[in-house]
Amino acid sequence: MSWSTVRADQFCTLITDGTHDSPKPQQSGRKLITSKHLKGHYIDFDSANWISEADYQKVISRSAVEQWDILFSMIGTIGNIYLENNPHVEYACKNMGIFKFSGNKADAFWMYYYLKSPQAKAYIQTHLRGSTQAYMPLGGLRDMPVPVPPQSVRNAIIAILRPVDEKIVCNNAINDNLLQQAQALYREMFINTTNDQRRTCRAEEYFDIAIGKTP
């Protein structure tokens, strides 16, 4: 069973990018996602701007994100990726690469894991452009060589990697929950609770503080 190598734009249905315009932020509407909002296994919608419905429709008419598309950060922190598994996508993208697969889940997962590989990361590093702010050109993404084994081999590799990915997501969720509990406990004990025995004091009353001296 031999492997072949094809360009990314031959493996994917389409490789495009989000809008290059700067829609005016709104108080409500639809979310506009940029590279900084990609957090690996999730998108940080809380810090993303709202844009108007008219601007949203304008953006998605050119580069709508669909289920099993891969988002790729092209500017700033380059190489962050996110695989969209939601069948109902209601956000737009700006300055971001979009690998499209026309709903082909198997191909999407193969490309997703390849983009995480040392080989793909090395290719990206050698094809960056820009002196003041580095960026990955769209042409570089399209020309990226992608190793493609037979489908049975791809399926076997994905079957190994996906459970590991799912475990990472689960552990991250547990860590986030523990952090929220710790923050809630801190607020309850030190901010929200009135305590007559609590007082403000100097650090030296509770700690031994020494200053280093020059020999």
What are these regions (language model features)?
Residues 5-24, 36-67, 204-215:
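Sequence-specific dsDNA recognition surfaces
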Residues 2, 74, 89-97, 129-158:
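A short glycine-rich beta-alpha junction/loop motif
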Residues 1-18, 143-214:
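Non-catalytic DNA-recognition/assembly elements of restriction-modification systems
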Residues 34-35, 53-116:
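A short beta-sheet element
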Residues 108-140:
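Short, positively charged
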Residues 1-4, 31, 89-90, 113, ...:
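Residues that recognize and position ribonucleotide moieties
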Residues 29, 47, 93-95:
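A generic structural signal for short beta-strands and their flanking turns/coil linkers
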